[in-house]
Amino acid sequence: MAFVGSRIWSGFPEPRFICGKNRVSPGQMDPELFFFSGCTLRCVYCQNYHIANSEVGKTVSVERLSEIFLELQEQGANNINLVTPTHFVPQIIAALDQARKKGLNLPIVYNTSGYEKVETLRRLNGYVDVYLPDFKYLDPEHAKKYSGAEDYPEVAKAALEEMVRQTGNPVFNDAGIMTKWCNCETFVIAWVSERCERIVKYLYETYGDQIYMSLMNQYTPLDNV
């Protein structure tokens, strides 16, 4: 399948993406992943460097993106997982509007770095069923050093609060599959491992059982990282 990326065309920017599969939670079938090229952060340990830091891929129109959503539903996809979609929110909303008019009813997963403006998330209210934000830092110095975003902790805290407000407590369907919830992901990196303990403590003390947490341990040193 094609990429949805960051090249700006006349009139309306057209996204580009790469499709894949990944398991969102126990009990769920594999969703379709849409990796949008480009990223709002510049993490020195990025595991998707070739996607986040380039215009790799094939551009598609909003109309074509809406058609792809519908095609995936017809093929039996369980949900649609949008990865690093922040800089294409207007186009995604337009594509979802078009697809819903034609019968799209799959849950939408918003898979993000957590570096989100609250006003952007509010535009997504009613469109997103599942939020999968990273929560990378509580220390501004770490955020600046490793991701170039000193304000990440405060931005991510406010963003997560809005995500939880929208999703509420986890919702399960009759098959025991979660259809509405918020899951925070924290990347485990050896040289700043103490940050994970602080983050887990903060998330639990703040949200308790309202959210799920995932500790990601797949860090691999890569070229250009």
Language model features by range: what are they?
Residues 144-174:
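Anionic-ligand binding region
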Residues 61-64, 155, 191-195:
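Soluble or luminal CAZymes and related metallo-dependent hydrolases
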Residues 73-98, 145, 151, 161, ...:
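Conserved glycine-rich "GG(E/T)P / GGGxP" loop and the immediately following alpha-helix
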Residues 79-81, 107-109, 130-132, 179-183, ...:
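Structural preference for beta-strand elements that scaffold enzyme active sites
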Residues 125-140, 212-218:
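Non-cysteine beta-strand/loop elements that form the S-adenosyl-L-methionine
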Residues 1, 168-225:
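Auxiliary Fe-S-binding modules of radical SAM enzymes
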Residues 52, 89, 114-117, 135-153, ...:
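Conserved radical SAM core fold
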Residues 3-126, 130, 140:
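Conserved Radical SAM active-site core
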